[in-house]
Amino acid sequence: MLSTLIRRLSRALLWFVAGSIVLVLVFRWVPPPGTALMVERKVQSWVNGEPIDLQRDWEPWENISDELKVAVIAGEDQKFANHWGFDLPAIQAALAHNERGGNIRGASTLTQQVAKNLFLWSGRSWFRKGLEAWFTALIELFWSKERILEVYLNSAEWGKGVFGAQAAARYHFGVDASRLSRQQAAQLAAVLPSPIKWSASRPSAYVASRAGWIRRQMSQLGGPSYLMQLDSSRKL
């Protein structure tokens, strides 16, 4: 009985490992048709009796404003070009902060956010965190930094039912993602921690202040020239 259970669990684990590797490899080239977060938002809207239509249009890397790319890095993950999926000092600082109580602070890199939004459900369990770490490692192993950021920008949530840079640019500013200004990009990046609560097009005092901070960080990073650091040659 025990040996049978072990064999079945081993087989299930093998299928999971193989399946997850295949998925990550496929999405290295193929645009994901959707994300786990999109499904979650759809289900939530049905349960709440307020069904929504998702707004989402995939745009390739070259059709997304460089200003938005840098703004997201400046606001969410300034070590993006240099780490392998995990910012250990930030994780340690977040754990120390959370142990002291108060508002819970996260330390997720852009790669971790892609792994979570693309493949996993919301939550803070250690099991989900373990899966997030697994997918993060796979993504960093098989994708270029440009691809990671491209998928992030096409799957990030920017409002109720609004996903991806193109839908966000049109919804908030009435322009294509390629035409976003630095200020508009900074405002979009500023709401990423809570895109349902905050609005990029009607910024609160806090969002306006955070957008200003992001613009200053963008300048310190070197602006669009920073993107040259995203070295795709290190990938398999």
Curated annotation (Swiss-Prot):
It catalyses: [GlcNAc-(1->4)-Mur2Ac(oyl-L-Ala-gamma-D-Glu-L-Lys-D-Ala-D-Ala)](n)-di-trans,octa-cis-undecaprenyl diphosphate + beta-D-GlcNAc-(1->4)-Mur2Ac(oyl-L-Ala-gamma-D-Glu-L-Lys-D-Ala-D-Ala)-di-trans,octa-cis-undecaprenyl diphosphate = [GlcNAc-(1->4)-Mur2Ac(oyl-L-Ala-gamma-D-Glu-L-Lys-D-Ala-D-Ala)](n+1)-di-trans,octa-cis-undecaprenyl diphosphate + di-trans,octa-cis-undecaprenyl diphosphate + H(+). Pfam families: Transgly. Signal peptide: none annotated. The keyword Transmembrane applies. GO terms for biological process: cell wall organization; peptidoglycan biosynthetic process; regulation of cell shape. The chain crosses the membrane at residues 12-31. One of its GO terms (cellular component) is peptidoglycan-based cell wall. Pathway: Cell wall biogenesis; peptidoglycan biosynthesis. SUPFAM superfamilies: Lysozyme-like (SSF53955). Its EC number is 2.4.99.28. It is found in: Cell inner membrane. The keyword Cell wall biogenesis/degradation applies. One of its GO terms (molecular function) is pentosyltransferase activity. It is a single-pass membrane protein. Keywords: Cell inner membrane, Cell membrane, Cell shape, Cell wall biogenesis/degradation, Glycosyltransferase, Membrane, Peptidoglycan synthesis, Transferase, Transmembrane, Transmembrane helix. InterPro entries: Glyco_trans_51, Lysozyme-like_dom_sf, PBP_transglycosylase, Pep_trsgly. HAMAP family: PGT_MtgA. Peptidoglycan polymerase that catalyzes glycan chain elongation from lipid-linked precursors. Belongs to the glycosyltransferase 51 family. This is Biosynthetic peptidoglycan transglycosylase. It comes from Pseudomonas putida (strain ATCC 700007 / DSM 6899 / JCM 31910 / BCRC 17059 / LMG 24140 / F1).
